[in-house]
Amino acid sequence: MAWRNPTSARQTPLYERSWVAMVALVAIFLAANFQLLTGEATEHWDGEQFFAPFFSYLASVVRSGHWLLWNPFSNAGSPDFVEPQIGALSPITLGFAAIAGPSAVAFRLYWLCLWLFGGIGMFVYARSLGAPVWGRFLAGLSFVFSGFYIGHGQHLSVIHSISFLPWIILRLDRALLTGRRAPALEAGALLGLSALAGNPAITISTGLFAGAYSAVRFFSSRASTIAGQVRPALETFALFGFVTAVVLSPTYFSFKYETVGYSDRSGPLTRECVVSSNGMQPVGLAAIVNPYGPGISRANAKDPRSPEVMSATYFGAAPLALAVLALALPGRRRWKWGMFFVGLLFLGFTLGTALPLRGWLYDLVPPTRYFRHPNMFRVFFIFSIIVLAVLASGKIEHWRRLGDAPEGVLRRFAIISAGLAALGISVITAFCFHYPRLGPYIETAVPHAVVVWLGLAAIAAGVSWRPAWLAHLPGALVVLTVGDLLCAHYLSADLAFNIGIGEPARSETKRSPVELGPENFARALVVGGNQQLFANKPVYCSYAALLNSLHMDSAEAGTLMAFATGEKRVWFSTDAVEAPVTAETLALLTKEGAARKAPVMLRHRRGTLLGETPPPPFNAEAIHNAPSAERVPFEVLTYRPNELSMKVECPEDGWVLITDRWSRSWRATVNGAETPIAGGNLFFRLLPVQAGENLIEMNFEPFLLWPLLTTSWTLLGLIGITAGLRAWQRAANRPPPPAPKLSTPPVPCGACS
């Protein structure tokens, strides 16, 4: 006989309280990553060479009371405020950097806080879907310990973007279901806020996923409900998109505006590059059921940073089984299958060249032409499957409280679990027989796969055999998933960080990041790992996102780089030959410079650099016959990131080449008269001068930055304050919980039917 569990007749047990589950989620996450805080584990790859140095530099600039706009230390100068992955215009990144400072511990704490923010968001979103406490816990745990977080743990901007995903969908879903405008505003503000310091690929993809999610909500809702009506749905999504565009505008408008003539990234990438660069291969789908697939791929790859390493997709055995069970259950079929097919669609984008989907997306959605790495789309598959698992947890909790489940449901769960167990064990077996090198953790990976998958099958079979054990199913799944994901984290942690090799080297300095002074005008050649950002030392070429392929080629050739480094890097010539900015020009310029031991002066009109006027024809004879440039006496008066002034002594009228990078927002005066800055020698600043002493003053003045930033932050503040006030009012008006009733004996289900 089934017995009803009278939960209303007693106080909620401690383990069924939401705050306890939340604390447990945070504690497990911190315990799994505690080595990052103690220094036993450190960032590596892009984390060590890009994100940590730039966070430290940004913190130093902010603490000095300035904005990071122009970075004079990297690549002979760079407009780094436009690079969203640095977060120079994000209130979150700036606030944390200002408070925590430029230390390595501060960077790792920021990293972990962002990472954990995603797990907490998934927990809260699962609650909005009606999940029980244990379902929320599983959702948060499986998301924050998923292979996507591990595979991209080195990429701080990716972690930043994806951790906002559940919060964005939470508020967007609320807006779609209620027709209220406030949640739509909040969803747009969250996506825009994430974009200010996030990865552009994830930002754009999140917008696509939000659109697909909204469509599923619309088509799976009855026409009598608000979510099923066309006009409210369109208004909600339009408001969401408008707020997003306003909030992210300081970074994204500036990126599109400032990078023209400076970086190759100002325009779309080629279709071939987008589709073929770091897409997941079909064999990578095995990572859905086994976390060690990327580890074995890494052990057998020539490059440890190969695309296979970034294909980690595992998020737990139990959540996957629950998701498949959700599809097999009656009720809300359009909603569940809609989410499933959206997940499959984004998984198809992940496969890159294996399917035509990513290419079609390139053709149909222009913003997707600006980023590569198709494997990043897999996070939306993970998210969709976890949503299905959340829905199944709600059903199981309902049956648990009733004391019984509909006939055949538990048998289905047992069959699903057994099938997935067979698949999971087959995958690890195939790994062992296929790959010659199995990696350092195979002795843990094999028992992990066997115990987890057979354990899941045994739990499901036991509940199917004895339905009375249904009351213990949530606890068993929670214990299994905690052990499963902690072991998976152990197997894959070295994809995200180094363990046990000590702190990476830092070229610390007492130099100011904003007051360079004449003594720091000298420029070095190349510094590995962006160490110049720790040392505040200008370099000609460094690792950065705002790439210019010709500039990188010039660094490899060496000749042009030699003329733009050292202390005496200001040149004069009576003539500057007009030439196009092409690889052919670079090759001839390098050849002439090597032969003459001095540069030839080339000029590039502003309109040509901006693509407003056609480039001049390449004239090799004119370049060959041009006079050699010469060094002239100069005195640096002011040298700051956004300001450079100097006196230059010129023998006659002509042109002065200052070997700091050209960018369209630099303004100049020569002897007090405003003078347009032309491009010189492909990358640098060229100014007309007169015979005698010339006072040259240059300032970096980004176009529309301050109006856009003021509007963005003001809108963020208004939406945030309004949301906070509403939350406070709801909490103040919430009725007190009812007094606990006296406990009563269990009542047979039949007596109440």
Annotate each predicted stretch with a short phrase:
Residues 17-48, 53, 240-257, 345-348, ...:
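Transmembrane signal-anchor helices characteristic of membrane glycosylation enzymes that use polyprenol
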Residues 51-62, 66-67, 91, 246-327, ...:
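Periplasmic/ER-lumenal interhelical loops and adjacent helix-loop junctions
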Residues 3-6, 156-163, 175-188, 192, ...:
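Contiguous transmembrane helix-bundle modules in multi-pass membrane proteins
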Residues 14, 348, 614-742:
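Active-site-proximal, structured, solvent-exposed surfaces of multi-pass membrane proteins
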Residues 123-144, 181-182:
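Transmembrane-helix signature of polytopic, membrane-embedded enzymes
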Residues 19, 28-122, 141-163, 260, ...:
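Membrane-interface coil-to-helix junctions
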Residues 99, 145, 149, 153, ...:
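Transmembrane helix irregularities
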Residues 292-293, 300-307, 311, 322, ...:
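Soluble catalytic regions of membrane-associated enzymes that act on cell-envelope
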